[in-house]
Each structure stands twice: as C-alpha cells, then as structure tokens.
Amino acid sequence: MKHMSIRAEEISALIKQQIENYQSEIEVSDVGTVIQVGDGIARAHGLDNVMAGELVEFSNGVMGLAQNLEENNVGIIILGPYTEIREGDEVRRTGRIMQVPVGKELIGRVVNPLGQPVDGLGPINTTNTRPIESPAPGVMDRKSVHEPLQTGIKAIDALVPIGRGQRELIIGDRQTGKTAVALDTIINQKDEDMICIYVAIGQKESTVRNVVETLRKHGALEYTIVVTASASQPAPLLYLAPYAGVTMGEEFMYNGKHVLVVYDDLSKQAAAYRELSLLLRRPPGREAYPGDVFYLHSRLLERAAKLSDAKGGGSLTALPFIETQAGDVSAYIPTNVISITDGQIFLQSDLFFSGVRPAIDAGTSVSRVGGSAQIKAMSKVSGTLRLDLASYRELEAFAQFGSDLDKATQAKLNRGARTVEVLKQGLHKPLRVEKQVIILYALTRGFLDDIPVVDITRFEEEFHAWLDSNATDLLEEIRTTKKLADDDKFAAAINGFKKVFVASE
C-alpha cells in the first residue's frame, strides 16, 4: 500500500474555501413578553415596532390582534382560549394583518369569524384570502342603486322596497320576527344568481343550528355562507364576525356578482366592542360605549355598495339588525345605525302579538333609495297602499268611539282591513314578485272589497294556485316585461277566479 502524503497547503486552502462560502442565516423577529393577561386581553412589553391591527402569535400557538399601542406596552385582544397564556410567555410579531379565507369554496359551509369550518364537514380548500379591514369603494367606483332585491315579503317589496347595494336596517324588540324576515329574503334569492351571507353574532348555538337547518330544508344553503360567533365565544370573535362576513362578500362583489349580507345583530357586536374597549382601558362615553362606536358600524356598512360598470357592476346589499329595548329607537346604537343606513324597517311587538305578521309598521318604516329600484308594475299597484294603511289606522282609532259612520269612512275601513289581511304572510313562504303584483292589483282596484275579511287569506292562497294553472301567460308577462299588463287581462283573471271561489258562510 502506497503511502499518501497530505500537504498542509491543500488543507489550509480547503478550510479557507469553506470559510468563504459559509453563510449564516440569522432570523430576526420582534419578540415581546406577556406582562398581564385576563378576560381575553393580554398586555405585552417589547413589541416596539408592531402595527395597529397586526396579528401576533403567543408561544402556545394562539393568535392575537394588536389594538392599543401604548408607550411601554401593547394591548392585544386574544383570538382564542386565553386560559393557557401565562405572564412571562413569549409573544412574537407575524408581520401580517388579519385576513380571512374567501372564495366559492365557502358556499354552503358554516364557519367562525376566522374562516375555520365549524360544521364538521372537513377543511375548506381555498388559498385565497382578503384583509378583514379594507377601504369602502370610493365615490367614483359606485353607481346609484337601480336593481330590485326581491325579498318575497309583500309588505317590504310594496312599501319599503330594497335595491341591490342598499343598506336597510331591520329594527325591533326581541321576538318580533327579525330573523324570519332575513331568512325569507335569503330563501327568496333562489334562481336569482345571488350569494347570501348570514352572520350570527352572539346567538345561541341552538338558534344558529335551526337557521342552518331551515336554509338547508328550503335549498338555500347551496348559495349561502353562515358565519357564526355564538354567545359562548370570546368577545373578540363577536366583534370581528361582521367584518369577516363582509370581507367574504366583497370577494364576490369585486368579481361582478351580487351579494346579500345579513348581520344578526349589530347590538351584540357593539356590546362586545364595548367590553373589549373597557378592558383595554379606553375612555368610555355615552352608555359606556367608546368614542369610536359610530365608526365601528359606519366602516362596516359603508362597504355595502352598487359598483360602477367599470368596476364590474357587482353589488353588496347589507341588512343589519338592531334589537331595541321596549321599542326605544332613540337609544345610542339605534340612532347611530339609523343615520348610517338608507332606510329602516320597524317591527312592532304590538302588531306581532295581535297577529299581524310580518309585524312591519308601515308608518315609520322607510326606504330612502329602494323606490328607484322597484319594478314599474309594483310601483303602480303599491302607490296608494301606504296612504290607505295610514288612513285606516287613524280611522280605526276614531271608529271605536262612534257607530254612525258615513259610507266613505266605512269604505276606507273595509279597504284597510283587507289591506292588513293581504299584507300578512306565513313563515318561510316568500312570494314571487309577479304574484305579489296581481294580488295587490286586486286589492287596490277594489276587486277584494266584496270578499269577507275572514276569507282573504284563503282567497289569496287559492288564487295563487289558480294562477299557476290558468294564467301562466299573465305571470310570465309581468316577470319578463316588469310592467303592468292590460287592465282587461287582470280583470279577466281575477273575475275568472272569483266565479269559482266559494266564500265561507
């Protein structure tokens, strides 16, 4: 075996080469220390360069959102269980602001405000995300509301019409049918090429389950996303839920689609935000809400819009809910949201308990922009409806005191009683707009004046079934032209049914 000589110069050259090629990868991350934790809030020291609204990560993997940037510490709201976080734990910056997954993969699913599925149907396969806080469309990016959003509820489509891109507040006490109005509207969007997002804020888990089952039963879950932050969730998730919902909707809006977002309800979001603000030691204002509670709702609802054609012509319609206490609409949060929205639908508990359902108060409900979105046929037949109802309510009060009424007053009372009956509607029975037009035409033109009040509901149900088999051409004409057909056609259809209708004894 030959003896191999090792030269010192070769070894030193190799070592020098290795040293020259050596690259040390140093990872620099901003790390802080938790100095206080409790009630879903943590304070951390050392995160000097953190951004407002930046996501931070605790050592146990729970995420947080930097909110209060103070001189010597940062107030963080914790987006998950905070009981595992201890004083002295490490917290590090992520360099990202909060984002949620978006896209058509979410349709038909139930998710939490972080976009994580909670329906047990496996993971959601989408890589697209959008920041949860984004600016609302600018003035030049918008277009005035001109397309109708048919709710399928006669009292709304006739008296307080809603257009695509509008913000219409639904306000009333608890147990007055607010959620039912929203669900009927979602169910009525079938075949309308509309994507619906139902955001449940602070609801009971059982209530959310019922909502999901109702949507599934009526085939509405195929075009609906449910975002839920139930009453058992920490306050930060209740605060973030509406923003998560609108962010998911914006993805479709900016792609030229039409979206309906229901926030059920914003009173609970405001209460959650008040809780967070007080725990972060922000100064309280009226009713202990922080000074920026108006901005909390305005920046959310301003993201609803009808986009200009240059931006794709998509729309996002918002139906925020506010729960009042004993009908007090002059409280802080109700007045704030009334001033932000383009109209409101008042639901009165007195009407609800007297059997008028949906319990819409026609006198105080308004739609500030929806009138221009109403189809011509509907605006023609519903023109006198509000006045008829208002004069009926007024005369009804006087009629209780006197029995001797002249014929004109008696006629108004009779027409008013029939109007109230026609505007009643069963739960989850939305009505197509062409059928609404025909029954309202019959009402306002006096065709129902000789039908007993007790028979009005039955007359309407049987009339709709009769139309489906005997007057499909008339329904199709209203659906396609969106205008009133010839008066003779209407009269022939209505009188044709009246001949076969049998009034009760």
Curated annotation (Swiss-Prot):
Record-level GO cellular component terms: plasma membrane; proton-transporting ATP synthase complex
Complex formation: F-type ATPases have 2 components, CF(1) - the catalytic core - and CF(0) - the membrane proton channel. CF(1) has five subunits: alpha(3), beta(3), gamma(1), delta(1), epsilon(1). CF(0) has three main subunits: a(1), b(2) and c(9-12). The alpha and beta chains form an alternating ring which encloses part of the gamma chain. CF(1) is attached to CF(0) by a central stalk formed by the gamma and epsilon chains, while a peripheral stalk is formed by the delta and b chains.
Subcellular location: Cell membrane
Top enzyme category: translocase
Amino acids binding ATP: G172, D173, R174, Q175, T176, G177, K178, T179
A Gene Ontology BP annotation from the UniProt entry: proton motive force-driven ATP synthesis
Its EC number(s): 7.1.2.2
MF terms (GO), sorted A to Z: ADP binding; ATP binding; proton-transporting ATP synthase activity, rotational mechanism
Keywords: ATP synthesis, ATP-binding, Cell membrane, CF(1), Hydrogen ion transport, Ion transport, Membrane, Nucleotide-binding, Translocase, Transport
CDD domains according to UniProt: ATP-synt_F1_alpha_C (cd18113), ATP-synt_F1_alpha_N (cd18116), F1-ATPase_alpha_CD (cd01132)
Entry-linked Pfam families: ATP-synt_ab, ATP-synt_ab_C, ATP-synt_ab_N
The protein, known as: ATP synthase subunit alpha
Site (Required for activity): S365
InterPro entries reported in the protein's UniProt record: ATP_synth_asu-like_sf, ATP_synth_asu_C, ATP_synth_asu_C_sf, ATP_synth_F1_a_nt-bd_dom, ATP_synth_F1_asu, ATPase_a/bsu_AS, ATPase_F1/V1/A1_a/bsu_N, ATPase_F1/V1/A1_a/bsu_N_sf
Region feature (Disordered): 118-138
Organism: Bacillus cereus (strain ATCC 14579 / DSM 31 / CCUG 7414 / JCM 2152 / NBRC 15305 / NCIMB 9373 / NCTC 2599 / NRRL B-3711)
Role noted for this protein: Produces ATP from ADP in the presence of a proton gradient across the membrane. The alpha chain is a regulatory subunit.
Catalytic activity: ATP + H2O + 4 H(+)(in) = ADP + phosphate + 5 H(+)(out)
Membrane topology: Peripheral membrane protein
Entry's family note: Belongs to the ATPase alpha/beta chains family.
